[in-house]
């Protein structure tokens, strides 16, 4: 049996095929342009889904018989779509400065202690909810037309299967998810003025969304029997892949941001955060995992390297 992992990153996506012994049979990667200015950090959601179909088509020609594909993605970034999943705007990256004022307004109304107790997060504009508020305030027509608010994992899963579901670990990156009840928090959403109906249904990590839609199967070369699974936020998946299952172990991962993902036997006390540190609590099955993020300034090194080939 062959299975595949599809990871949606902030600058590119990768599809890797494995056999039942865990041996890598092949991989495909596509990057997509990210636009960064002083006032906006953006990526075209359509570029992401086009790249997803490109890597699936490449692997579909070589390994059309895979049984399932698990989807992971980076957190925070989302897109408002119409009923069919077509993007209504350019997606804001989690590093986008917009949403800071909206986050402060939420914090003033609810208090940082209440937000932290519910979501496990110190309020910050990097999370989805303040940016959704920004869109509602600045692009009201986009919000009015929206039928879905999708983060990148559930965006891809929805377009592949027609099912709008988001795993718990990625839902925590919105600042609207209650880690105690593992549901969307209606009070926070009400204060934010965001309709819960637009959000995907939260499900445990590793929940199958369904089989590949006929049009997606035709485009990629995979079977309509292919199962698509909502796996997790990328750092949680990385910890599992590194064998970090037991309390006292952690994964340190350096990418666009520096992440430390430790495992706990139970929910640790909130405590205080050092300046610049942000925390989330992805909840995966029976284990509680705290994802401690050090939010780093993202330089333009990738842009420089791409713009000057052979000089870096």
Regions found by a protein language model. Give the residues of each.
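Carbohydrate-associated surface elements
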Residues: 96
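Active-site core segments that coordinate phosphate-bearing ligands/cofactors
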Residues: 3-5, 100, 107-120, 130-165, ...
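N-terminal glycine/serine-rich phosphate-binding loop of ATP-dependent small-molecule kinases
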Residues: 1-89, 117, 217-218, 222-227
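Glycine-rich phosphate-binding loops at beta-strand->alpha-helix junctions
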Residues: 12, 204-212, 258
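Short beta-strand-loop/turn "lid" adjacent to the catalytic site in phosphate-handling enzymes
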Residues: 61-93, 122-128, 157-178, 201-204, ...
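Gly-rich Lys/Arg/Thr-decorated short loops/hinges at beta-loop-alpha junctions or inter-strand turns
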Residues: 32-38, 114-115, 165-172, 194-198
């Amino acid at each position: 049996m062959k299975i595949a992992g599809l990871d949606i990153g902030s600058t590119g996506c990768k599809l890797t095929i494995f056999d039942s012994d865990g041996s890598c049979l092949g991989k495909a990667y596509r990057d997509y342009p990210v636009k960064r200015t002083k006032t906006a950090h953006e990526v075209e959601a359509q570029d992401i889904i086009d790249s997803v179909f490109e890597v699936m088509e490449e692997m579909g020609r070589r390994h059309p018989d895979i049984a399932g594909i698990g989807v992971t993605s980076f957190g925070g970034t989302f897109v408002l779509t119409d009923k069919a999943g077509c993007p209504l705007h350019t997606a804001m990256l989690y590093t986008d400065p917009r949403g800071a004022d909206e986050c402060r307004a939420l914090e003033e109304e609810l208090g940082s202690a209440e937000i932290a107790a519910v979501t496990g997060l110190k309020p910050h504009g990097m999370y989805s909810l303040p940016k959704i508020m920004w869109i509602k305030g600045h692009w009201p027509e986009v919000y009015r037309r929206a039928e879905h608010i999708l983060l990148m994992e559930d965006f891809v899963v929805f377009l592949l299967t027609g099912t709008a579901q988001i795993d718990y670990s990625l839902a925590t990156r919105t600042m609207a998810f209650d880690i105690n009840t593992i549901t969307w928090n209606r009070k926070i959403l009400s204060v934010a003025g965001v309709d819960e109906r637009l959000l995907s249904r939260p499900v445990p990590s590793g929940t199958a969304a369904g089989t590949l839609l006929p049009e997606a199967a035709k485009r990629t070369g995979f079977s309509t029997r292919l199962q698509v699974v909502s796996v997790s936020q990328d750092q949680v998946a990385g910890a599992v892949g590194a064998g970090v299952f037991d309390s006292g172990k952690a994964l340190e991962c350096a990418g666009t941001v520096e992440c430390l993902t430790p495992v706990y036997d139970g929910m640790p006390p909130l405590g205080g955060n050092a300046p610049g540190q942000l925390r989330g609590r992805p909840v995966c099955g029976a284990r509680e995992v705290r994802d401690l993020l050090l939010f780093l300034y993202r330089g333009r090194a990738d842009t420089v390297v791409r713009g000057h080939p052979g000089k870096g």
